[in-house]
Amino acid sequence: MADTEVEMQVSAADTNNNENGQAQSNYEYDVNVQDEEDEAAAGPMPLQMLEGNGITASDIKKIHEAGYYTVESIAYTPKRQLLLIKGISEAKADKLLGEASKLVPMGFTTATEYHIRRSELITITTGSKQLDTLLQGGVETGSITELFGEFRTGKSQICHTLAVTCQLPIDMGGGEGKCLYIDTEGTFRPVRLLAVADRYGLNGEEVLDNVAYARAYNADHQLELLQQAANMMSESRFSLLVVDSCTALYRTDFSGRGELSARQMHLARFMRTLQRLADEFGIAVVITNQVVAQVDGISFNPDPKKPIGGNILAHSSTTRLSLRKGRGEQRICKIYDSPCLPESEAIFAINSDGVGDPKEIIAPV
């Protein structure tokens, strides 16, 4: 009789353990599913989500071949651009825009909700604490940051450092994503990435594998590379796009006042595409810009150099940073234009392991 009672108690305990184990398993499954759903909701939506309600797989293939890879890209595109796609009628374009607008929020929201979204934005560390403080956390994702200055002011060095720090975990000031690097001047050096990777304890080979590099040879090619970039970003997680330099090829491909209008129109299209990528994929876009001397007949001009690109570039960039040389390896960064950052300066240094803080600040002579 006693043995029977013991067996019944053991059996009941086993049943409870099985139920608890099953409940734990179900809980872990639910958490994993929720994490996957949250991750999917946070990223861009694939075109396949538009299929149905009169939109066929053939239509999806047509717009994909035309260079549209996400639902967001359809929602942000004017109707007349969709009509240029072969095989897309006006009725079909209306259908595409209607279905995309249901999935992508494009209406009004309260300032409170927008403030909450802004507070959740990821910033990517520059490698310098002083520079990060100036930028209130680092380079902002979802917007365009422009670096301009004369030669040897640290523009390319900041880009090289960011190409590594964007791969860091978010709690270390990174973006947990790959980098896409467009080089127009032939100044990209992978050995600099290895030095920065070693500084942060990252595997050098993995860091280089996570940087997609392309050399642009003319202004048209530079714009075409953004089309390839959109395709790559739709397939993998990128957190940074670098264009170094954004304007170098425009200065040589378009010469004289006779081509000024064509140059500015082409540059405006390029900058608009950059902003679309930032909006669509939530990446940080960093561009470098050159400067030109001002010859205006004024005998005294405290700042004789200005960034090129005119009003097109000035209005397209969200944050503009002016860089100038300091003493030794020190460089000075000034907020030139920003919708939210105060006009102030910070001193950083170019070290053997990338951009960092100066060991001691040397006052200029």
UniProtKB/Swiss-Prot annotation:
Query: CDD domains, from UniProt?
Result: Rad51
Q: Name one GO biological process term.
A: meiotic strand invasion
Q: Which SMART domains match?
A: AAA
Report the GO terms under cellular component. Answer: chromatin; chromosome, centromeric region; condensed nuclear chromosome; nuclear envelope; nucleus; site of double-strand break
Amino acid composition bias (Polar residues), ranges on this chain = 12-25
- Alphabetized UniProt keyword annotations: ATP-binding, DNA damage, DNA recombination, DNA repair, DNA-binding, Magnesium, Nucleotide-binding, Nucleus
* Localization per record: Nucleus
Q: Which Pfam families match?
A: HHH_5, Rad51
Main location, first listed in the record: nucleus
Cited InterPro entries: AAA+_ATPase, DNA_recomb/repair_Rad51, DNA_recomb/repair_Rad51_C, DNA_recomb/repair_RecA-like, DNA_repair_Rad51/TF_NusA_a-hlx, P-loop_NTPase, RecA_ATP-bd, RecA_monomer-monomer_interface
Which sites bind ATP?
G149, E150, F151, R152, T153, G154, K155, S156
Q: Cell membrane as a keyword?
A: no
Q: Where are the transmembrane segments?
A: none
Region annotation Disordered: residue ranges? 1-25
GO molecular function list: ATP binding; ATP hydrolysis activity; ATP-dependent activity, acting on DNA; ATP-dependent DNA damage sensor activity; DNA strand exchange activity; double-stranded DNA binding; identical protein binding; single-stranded DNA binding
Q: Briefly, what is this protein's role?
A: Required both for recombination and for the repair of DNA damage caused by X-rays. Binds to single and double-stranded DNA, in the presence of magnesium, and exhibits DNA-dependent ATPase activity. Promotes DNA strand annealing and strand exchange via DNA recombinase activity and forms helical nucleoprotein filaments.
The similarity annotation says:
Belongs to the RecA family. RAD51 subfamily.
What PANTHER family does the record tag this protein with?
A: DNA REPAIR PROTEIN RAD51 HOMOLOG 1 (PTHR22942:SF39), RECA/RAD51/RADA DNA STRAND-PAIRING FAMILY MEMBER (PTHR22942)
Subunit structure, as described in the record: Interacts with rad22, rad54, rdh54, rhp54, rti1, swi2 and swi5. Forms homooiligomers.
* Record's protein name: DNA repair protein rhp51
Source organism per entry reads Schizosaccharomyces pombe (strain 972 / ATCC 24843)
